[in-house]
Regions:
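Acidic/aromatic-lined carbohydrate-recognition and catalytic surfaces
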Residues: 2-187, 191, 204-261
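Conserved small/polar residues in nucleotide/adenosyl-binding loops
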Residues: 295-298
């Protein structure tokens, strides 16, 4: 049996903003990437991993997506993307998209609706919790970007969870309607012809229902959310569902960013018989200083 194509592929990451500027405005763009395909082909690469090009307020360099099916105007148009895809494929180069579905931008229409009222149809697309009696955050979790992982929204006087910036509310993967919309969006890109996805923070999409205070490390103000958000109880269920609904229908390369995951756990995401992802970015082996605790995952 022939190995999957991606097992022998050479992947080259392109960060569009700084790669090649075709129109002289000082910002790299999709036309710039297309103009350098011959150069990339000469390098001998097989795959371009394209960092986020979706519409975004750019709070986190495009990892805060406000429209999953639109191109950030400073990078060009959807026609520019289609031309890049066509020209890359003509040269035997595949395109893998960066995909961010642990969270969205707070300017995404889902969140704009979600925050309007407690009974809004999109309310449960995100993770909301009541304040404590004194009005403080539901627990002591800290954000990866500093400060609390909770943001009070005055519209309904409830907090929403954001493991990253306050402008990046976490999506509620427990909601099947949210998952349906994510799979529909992924299918749209696959039908367009993309060759896979690199999935940002995919090990964090399943949070535990119980959200107690996290352990506070010496010298830190906030608690560790890891035991309650990384490798949550349904993460493999969701990825198997994603595989069945979308990934298995196409010839794709899928890479999961799995920070906080042990080598043993990583094999569950990308094992031959896991029916989840092709491979993962696994970080434990580069934690030379031993500053990250993985004990809760063993």
């Amino acid at each position: 049996m022939k190995d999957a194509w991606w097992k022998e592929a050479v992947v080259y990451q392109v960060y569009p903003r700084s790669f090649m500027d075709a129109n002289g405005d000082g910002i790299g763009d999709l036309q710039g990437v297309t103009s350098r395909l011959d150069y990339l082909q000469e390098l001998g690469i097989d795959v371009i991993w394209l960092s986020p090009v979706y519409q975004s307020p750019n709070v986190d360099n495009g990892y805060d997506i406000s429209d999953y099916q639109a191109i950030q105007p400073e990078f060009g148009t959807m026609a520019d993307f289609d031309e890049l895809l066509k020209q890359a494929h003509r040269r035997g180069i595949r395109i893998v998209m960066d995909l961010v579905v642990n969270h969205s931008s707070d300017q995404h229409p889902w969140f704009v609706e979600s925050r309007k009222s407690k009974d809004n149809p999109y309310r449960d697309y995100y993770i909301w919790r009541k304040p404590k009696e004194d009005g403080s955050a539901p627990n002591n979790w800290g954000s990866c970007f500093g400060g609390s992982a909770w943001q009070l929204d005055p519209e309904t006087n409830m907090y929403y969870l954001h493991l990253f910036a306050p402008q990046q509310p976490d999506l509620n993967w427990k909601n099947p309607k949210l998952r349906d919309d994510v799979y529909r969006m992924m299918t749209w890109w696959c039908d367009k012809g993309v060759d896979g996805f690199r999935m940002d923070q995919i090990s964090a999409i399943s949070k535990m229902d119980d959200m107690p205070d996290g352990e506070v490390a010496p010298g830190q103000q906030y608690g560790n959310y890891g035991p309650y958000c990384i490798n949550g109880p349904h993460v493999h269920e969701y990825l198997k569902e994603m595989n069945a609904r979308v990934l298995s229908r196409y010839d794709l390369m899928t890479v999961g960013e799995t920070a906080g995951v042990t080598i043993e756990e990583a094999q569950k995401y990308a094992g031959e018989d896991s029916h989840e992802l092709s491979m993962v970015f696994q970080f434990e082996h580069v934690d030379v200083a031993g500053t990250v605790s993985y004990t809760h995952l063993r």
